[in-house]
Amino acid sequence: MSAFVRVVPRISRSSVLTRSLRLQLRCYASYPEHTIIGMPALSPTMTQGNLAAWTKKEGDQLSPGEVIAEIETDKAQMDFEFQEDGYLAKILVPEGTKDIPVNKPIAVYVEDKADVPAFKDFKLEDSGSDSKTSTKAQPAEPQAEKKQEAPAEETKTSAPEAKKSDVAAPQGRIFASPLAKTIALEKGISLKDVHGTGPRGRITKADIESYLEKSSKQSSQTSGAAAATPAAATSSTTAGSAPSPSSTASYEDVPISTMRSIIGERLLQSTQGIPSYIVSSKISISKLLKLRQSLNATANDKYKLSINDLLVKAITVAAKRVPDANAYWLPNENVIRKFKNVDVSVAVATPTGLLTPIVKNCEAKGLSQISNEIKELVKRARINKLAPEEFQGGTICISNMGMNNAVNMFTSIINPPQSTILAIATVERVAVEDAAAENGFSFDNQVTITGTFDHRTIDGAKGAEFMKELKTVIENPLEMLL
């Protein structure tokens, strides 16, 4: 009996699923009616991602809005919320799998729980060639159903095979804190190998660190044994492997995460493709510090301004005065796009790498609102809970290393297609000439700010003008109120 396959386009009710391929296939001679769940596109630029964890197991009921998996994109770990009623019949891709292309089948769901056992041995190849190769968005208009008779030689493969599936299904949800998941992904650790000591066996940061410490000890013991038998170690060397270090060398190979790979690609693109130049300026922040102290003294716990909050506002004012610094270079559109709004990207160090959450429309916001937004964004950035639109974009960037008193000057790499990034060093007390002082000098609090500019968008004279305006605003902070 030949198998007939009906492919029915289904339009999702979710913004996530509208960007992922979901094809309903019914094989009359094999499997009950079911739906293939594709790898979702969780951001406009996402082409692939890592499946960090399944939060549902095979046979579990699915309800609209429930999280069924955690997906790691290039710069964030995000929840995949499903928007249909049904049951998870088969997991096609195990958790921990990396670099899964968008739309690739990752699971199967059915509407009737009684159909779940039929998919015990369902495999990725059984999902049908159309579901793996089609990349175009499905049309919204209903299409006439088409039946296509399969060739006789393919009839055998339409029925479920008796042998066990190569994809092992997870044994249940693994509970872990967001920080623990982040560190595990960065270090290439499977959470299944870690014993959780938190409530309900929840894996914590301490559990991950304990696992790493034990692994390190075992590794050192192994290398010690190998060093004791150099003849055996020599014979085990294989051709084509990485150059072997000396017998006394100690090192650790850390897998390159998706995030580190993307950061590396973008920064390499920036350094090789942008004709950048730098302009540095020593700027007095004594008045800025006094303003901050005065405002915080009367805040009544409504806000607590940092130096960085004030600098973000100062950069905003300078960008409005010199629009060339607040622009994109867009060669594909043959334009330089100058923005009227100022969206400041704030560089934040996280356990997995650098993120740049965005404070949008800073020109229309006061200091307290900017401060509160930065604190909230930084908090979520450090546990990889930012939405893509919260860190993708921005019109100008600030990178602040002022908390490290060893950094008195540094430069940053432009984040394309932006044209400007400001590098903020630490505050230094500097002796300056002061005729009114008893000894002829006094001490001033100064900071070195270095701007890196894209010469295609903003000429050197304009870059210098921007730094002059920034210096003026910082040294006369009341101008931020104008």
Swiss-Prot record:
CDD domains: lipoyl_domain (cd06849)
Reaction(s) the record says it catalyses: N(6)-[(R)-dihydrolipoyl]-L-lysyl-[protein] + acetyl-CoA = N(6)-[(R)-S(8)-acetyldihydrolipoyl]-L-lysyl-[protein] + CoA
Residue range covered by the transit peptide: 1-28
Keywords noted in UniProt: Acyltransferase, Lipoyl, Mitochondrion, Transferase, Transit peptide
GO BP field: pyruvate decarboxylation to acetyl-CoA
Cofactor: binding comment: Binds 1 lipoyl cofactor covalently.
EC numbers, comma separated: 2.3.1.12
Protein name as it appears in the record: Dihydrolipoyllysine-residue acetyltransferase component of pyruvate dehydrogenase complex, mitochondrial
